[in-house]
Curated annotation (Swiss-Prot):
Chief location bin: cytoplasm
The name this protein goes by in its record: ATP-dependent Clp protease proteolytic subunit 1
Enzyme class: hydrolase
Organism: Corynebacterium efficiens (strain DSM 44549 / YS-314 / AJ 12310 / JCM 11189 / NBRC 100395)
Example of a GO biological process term: protein quality control for misfolded or incompletely synthesized proteins
Annotated function: Cleaves peptides in various proteins in a process that requires ATP hydrolysis. Has a chymotrypsin-like activity. Plays a major role in the degradation of misfolded proteins.
Record's subunit section: Fourteen ClpP subunits assemble into 2 heptameric rings which stack back to back to give a disk-like structure with a central cavity, resembling the structure of eukaryotic proteasomes.
Keyword list, A-Z: Cytoplasm, Hydrolase, Protease, Serine protease
Compartments reported by the entry: Cytoplasm
Family to which this protein belongs: Belongs to the peptidase S14 family.
């Protein structure tokens, strides 16, 4: 019997498996199993589909237990700025602390989400990398008035991103602007020094 947890089409489809419990057997999948442990996995681009999925999980997990932490694992190249801010606002809105952990990479929008985890609960694995830069822009066209509107919106998004990163890293918005004028790539240790994370996790095998 399926547990009803559907993996979005944007995700790589992983095989389901049968799990034995005191109540019998049930069909499940890795994402559903992680969800049961209050773990959300962002392993795709940040877009409207992944944002809606993550926001729904955050809200459901809050409803299930508003006082128990949620963990978000991140391995993402980034993506849409509006989708980023939708996830960000939901992370700040829900009552549970959201712990963030970078596996692989957290680039662009995903780096902001990594930094937005609860203070003291942001981490990365030793070989993870973090990339920050100004919000990407697409080619603009149209009348002069349209271009002015688009330019103003691009500047608004950039200032919002700088303010958000400043709030979570302790860097000034001015320093964030300088650092994100071009791609800034950080190792896990570099992200720790920059204030994007609070710790670099050791491998579990080393602690056994």
């Amino acid at each position: 019997m399926s547990n009803g947890f559907q993996m979005p089409s944007s995700r790589y489809v992983l095989p389901s498996f049968i799990e034995q419990s005191a109540y019998g057997t049930k069909e499940t999948n890795p994402y559903a199993k992680l969800f049961e442990e209050r773990i959300i996995f962002l392993g795709t681009q940040v877009d409207d589909t992944s944002a809606n999925d993550i926001m729904a999980q955050l809200l459901v997990l809050e409803g299930m237990d508003p006082d128990r932490d949620i963990t978000m694992y991140i391995n993402s190249p980034g993506g849409s700025f509006t989708a980023l801010m939708a996830i960000y606002d939901t992370m700040q809105y829900v009552r549970p602390d959201v712990q963030t952990v970078c596996l692989g990479q957290a680039a662009s929008a995903a780096a902001v989400l990594l930094a937005a985890g609860a203070p003291g609960k942001r981490a990365a694995l030793p070989n993870a990398r973090v990339l920050i830069h100004q919000p990407a822009t697409q080619g603009t066209q149209g009348q002069v008035s349209d271009l002015e509107i688009q330019a103003a919106e691009i500047e608004r998004m950039r200032k919002l991103m700088e303010t958000t990163l400043s709030q979570h890293t302790g860097k000034t918005p001015e320093q964030i602007r300088i650092d994100t004028d071009r791609d800034k790539i950080l190792t896990a240790e570099g992200a720790l020094e920059y204030g994007i994370i609070d710790q670099v996790f050791d491998y579990r095998k080393l602690n056994t």
